[in-house]
UniProtKB/Swiss-Prot annotation:
Organism: Prochlorococcus marinus (strain MIT 9313)
Ranges of Basic residues composition bias in the record: 1-13
Family label: Belongs to the universal ribosomal protein uS4 family.
UniProt-recorded name of the protein: Small ribosomal subunit protein uS4
Name of the gene: rpsD
Annotated ranges, domain S4 RNA-binding: 90-152
Keyword presence, rRNA-binding: yes
Function: One of the primary rRNA binding proteins, it binds directly to 16S rRNA where it nucleates assembly of the body of the 30S subunit. With S5 and S12 plays an important role in translational accuracy.
Lineage, highest ranks first: Bacteria, Bacillati, Cyanobacteriota, Cyanophyceae, Synechococcales
GO terms classed as biological process: ribosomal small subunit biogenesis; translation
InterPro entries: Ribosomal_uS4, Ribosomal_uS4_bac-type, Ribosomal_uS4_CS, Ribosomal_uS4_N, S4_RNA-bd, S4_RNA-bd_sf
């Protein structure tokens, strides 16, 4: 399953606020579609599926990528759900979004893919790169790159800079000073339901 490229507000009406997907808030509170306002009891499977979809759409990843992250999270010590969120938060495109370099995760990914971002002084165009403590993430020293980031920093998206990252706005550079903690995740999500969703699938 590839990344979603359709109307973003349609997704937020169904799943709630997704800071990584869009800056805009849905005007209608009920889900899209002809029967969107109908009230019906959701099954446990539907609830788990919804939480899984929140992760996919917020971080802009495909189903195949998410399955890989779930497997990685399971292989690590500690809570699988917390490990999963940390893996997604540490992606380079998400870090750039949290810093305000991009208005959304897809916008930040575009900056990375087009060579506007450096890690430890070298241009890195791999959006899935796992940022770690000690890494310095910055906007490339190039007029076009700086201009793009300046516009985004002036009107930042819905995420904020988490405590484990120190941002120097003037230099458009940030240093990751520690590991990401669960409470610093901007998305409202029940990661345990995501783990349960994949418990029999992966």
């Amino acid at each position: 399953m590839s990344r979603y490229r359709g109307p973003r507000l349609r997704i937020t009406r169904r799943l709630g606020d997704l800071p990584g997907l869009t800056r805009k808030a849905a005007k209608r509170s009920h889900p899209p579609g002809q029967h969107g306002q109908a009230r019906r009891k959701r099954s446990e499977y539907a609830i788990r599926l919804e939480e899984k979809q929140k992760l996919r759409f917020n971080y802009g990843i495909s189903e195949r990528q998410l399955v890989r992250y779930v497997k990685k999270a399971r292989a690590q010590d500690g809570s699988t759900g917390t490990n999963l969120l940390k893996l997604l938060e540490n992606r380079l495109d998400n870090v750039c979004f949290r810093l305000g370099f991009g208005p959304t995760v897809p916008g930040a990914r575009q900056l990375v893919n087009h060579g506007h971002v450096t890690v430890n002084g070298r241009v890195l165009d791999i959006a899935s790169y796992q940022c770690k403590a000690g890494d310095v993430v910055a906007i490339r020293e190039r007029k076009g790159s700086k201009k793009l980031a300046e516009a985004n920093l002036e009107f930042p998206g819905l995420a904020n800079v988490p405590p484990h990252i120190e941002l120097d706005k003037a230099k458009m550079s940030a240093k990751i000073i520690s590991k990401c903690e669960r409470e610093w995740v901007a998305l409202e999500i029940n990661e345990l339901l995501v783990v349960e969703y994949y418990s029999r699938k992966v």
